[in-house]
């Protein structure tokens, strides 16, 4: 998306992370533009306020979400790295762990650029070992997606590459625990409810999932894993004010 002539055309580049700024310096060391990093914020208060108990029940019924579940919300593009997640699930279930959990995926199980990768994913997901514990919901409506996220035990985000992840920003507003791949942008974006893992190590991820699920099941940690949405929205407004001030510095 960034041409070699961009620095001759634009005097200023606005990027979503310091990690992206480092990439700019790495790939275009001769650029002459001023770089501004502005972290965007998910403004989802209207959608969150639309999540009523009735909607939550309808989502549970529609998608048959009767058991505790872990949510993986990304599209199935190869850089989103679902392979480490499904291999971790396979590892857990082969060892007889978390057999009473579901692993919920949204997004379309297609990637025209990497059909062999999708075939590899599908082979594991449809195997006898894991198929009973995996739910592929496809594309879901935005408010339904947030309701699914809200009621998950926790979220897993295994990406190998992100700009500034919307999934994590949404999870922050819902005040959810998120297991994050330890890529630089996630280290920059994480908050205190994030747990980092090596995105190339399914066994480490399996252990992190099992440990997090065990903690989530304890009564003394119930509130932590349910999330404090009121606090999440307050944090969203605080970060939105910082975002607005940053944009003012750039454009005014």
What residue spans do the PLM features occupy?
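Single conserved hydrophobic/aromatic residue that forms the stacking wall/gate
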Residues: 1-6, 10
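Nucleotide-activated donor-binding/catalytic signature segment of Leloir-type glycosyltransferases, i.e.
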Residues: 118-143
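Aromatic "clamp/platform" in nucleotide-sugar-dependent glycosyltransferases that forms part
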Residues: 160
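Conserved acidic donor-binding segment of nucleotide-sugar-dependent glycosyltransferases
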Residues: 195-203, 211-217
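C-terminal alpha-helical cap of glycosyltransferases
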Residues: 210, 233-252
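Short alpha-helical donor nucleotide-sugar binding micro-motif in glycosyltransferases
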Residues: 147-152
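Conserved donor-binding/catalytic core segment of Leloir-type glycosyltransferases
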Residues: 64-80, 86-89, 104
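Short hydrophobic beta-strand element within catalytic cores of glycosyltransferases
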Residues: 168, 173, 177-180
């Amino acid at each position: 998306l960034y041409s070699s002539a961009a620095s001759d055309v634009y005097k200023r580049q606005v990027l979503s992370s310091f990690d992206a700024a480092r990439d700019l310096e790495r790939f275009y060391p001769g650029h002459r533009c001023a770089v501004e990093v502005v972290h965007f914020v998910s403004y989802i208060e209207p959608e969150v306020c639309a999540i009523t108990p009735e909607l939550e029940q309808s989502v549970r019924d529609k998608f048959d979400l009767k058991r505790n579940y872990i949510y993986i919300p990304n599209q199935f593009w190869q850089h989103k790295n679902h392979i480490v997640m499904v291999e971790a699930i396979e590892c857990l279930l082969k060892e007889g762990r978390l057999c009473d959990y579901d692993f919920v995926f949204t997004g379309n199980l297609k990637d025209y650029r990497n059909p062999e990768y999708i075939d590899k994913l599908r082979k594991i997901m449809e195997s006898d070992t894991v198929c009973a514990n995996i739910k592929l919901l496809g594309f879901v409506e935005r408010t339904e997606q947030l309701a699914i996220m809200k009621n998950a035990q926790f979220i897993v985000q295994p990406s190998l590459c992100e700009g500034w992840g919307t999934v994590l920003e949404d999870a922050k507003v819902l005040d959810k625990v998120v297991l994050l791949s330890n890529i630089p942008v996630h280290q920059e974006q994480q908050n205190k409810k994030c747990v980092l893992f090596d995105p190339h190590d399914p066994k480490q991820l399996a252990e992190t999932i099992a440990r997090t699920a065990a903690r989530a099941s304890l009564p003394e940690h119930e509130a932590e894993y349910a999330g404090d949405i009121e606090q999440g929205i307050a944090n969203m407004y605080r970060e939105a004010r910082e975002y607005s001030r940053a944009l003012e510095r750039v454009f005014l």
